[in-house]
A protein has these predicted regions:
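Mid-domain alpha/beta scaffold segments of enzyme catalytic cores
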Residues: 1-113, 117-121, 194, 285, ...
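H/E-rich (His + Asp/Glu) clusters that bind or coordinate divalent metals
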Residues: 15, 157-159, 163-298
């Protein structure tokens, strides 16, 4: 079975070869994933290195091509650049499969024009959410409820990365709000949750336990990721996270199948779905759900 890592970075400071990356990713049990382009100069992670948008697209596209068809290129876009909306069309034409946005210097509402264009070109958006180790004042732009403005972009597919740590409870509530936006207000928004650390291992049990016991089924919307990079793919960290999550969901499933909370029961009845097996949350997060996010399958 193909195992996807949905959160892999490229860096301008640390060039990487596809061959070396594939050796490490294969050793960790990863056979595909979403690779994020070198960051734009406006992001602190660029460390002042200014590479034109098209060149950054080409670099990640060519790297993915060299790695094989199960690796998908994602363009990291700065929505404050004057031609940001035009870059979305260019990204589609260049073969990008998704957009990456980090709100380091602006509120998520500044992303709306780019996100509307992303809907037009059928490109999903991976947002950073949660605290940022970026050395600047950015926390107030990255809480889950800051992304309520995405209700103004019907048809958008987007993901919140890192389960929004440390605002994980807010992330759960936001997920519920988006479910309601679709059912009651026909927004046709698809929200995914990227579980890349981010959220430390000591928090993960309670986060996923609360998702489950509230009746919010992540079977088709959870994305497994590790948030490492192609130049120094951390096989030990990847293996640890895979094994940790596999065991976590198996242990949570026993409690979940015997839980009869009022809200969870109401959610299950409204969705007219059987109670999910939480082992499927893990299996799908590492396999089918990235393809769902990218629109390969529904």
């Amino acid at each position: 079975m193909i195992v996807y890592d949905s959160h892999i970075h490229m860096s301008s400071r640390h060039p990487a070869s596809p061959e070396d990356f594939l050796k490490k990713s294969s050793a960790a049990g990863i056979s595909g994933g979403l690779i994020l382009s070198i960051p734009p100069v406006g992001n602190p992670d660029a460390y002042g290195v200014d590479i034109p948008a098209f060149e950054r697209m080409e670099k990640v596209r060519d790297f993915c091509k060299a790695c094989g068809p199960e690796f998908f290129p994602c363009f990291w876009i700065d929505v404050l650049e004057k031609d940001a909306v035009e870059q979305v069309k260019l990204a589609k034409e260049t073969g990008m499969r998704a957009l990456k946005i980090i709100c380091s210097r602006h509120a998520p509402s500044a992303c709306i024009p780019v996100c509307r264009e992303a809907v037009k070109y059928d490109l999903p958006v991976l947002f950073h959410s949660g605290i940022l180790w970026d050395g600047v004042d950015s926390g107030n732009y990255n809480r889950p409820c800051d992304f309520e403005c995405m209700t103004e972009v019907p048809g958008l597919t987007f993901a919140l990365a890192h389960i929004s740590w440390p605002w994980t409870d807010e992330c759960i509530a936001f997920y519920g709000k988006m479910l309601h936006a679709n059912s009651a207000h026909k927004r046709n928004i698809r929200l995914f949750i990227d579980d890349a650390p981010g959220t430390p291992d000591i928090y993960r049990r309670n986060v996923f336990r609360n998702f489950a016991l509230l009746g919010y089924d992540l079977s088709e919307t959870l994305l497994f990721g590790v948030d490492t990079n192609v130049s120094n793919y951390n096989t030990e960290w990847v293996e640890y996270t895979l094994n940790f999550d596999r065991e976590l969901f198996a242990s949570l499933n026993d409690e979940f199948q015997n839980f009869d909370g009022y809200l969870a029961k109401a959610v299950f009845e409204k969705q007219n779905k059987p109670r999910p097996d939480l082992n499927d949350w893990f299996t799908n997060s590492t396999s089918r759900n990235l393809l769902r996010f990218l629109g390969e399958i529904r």
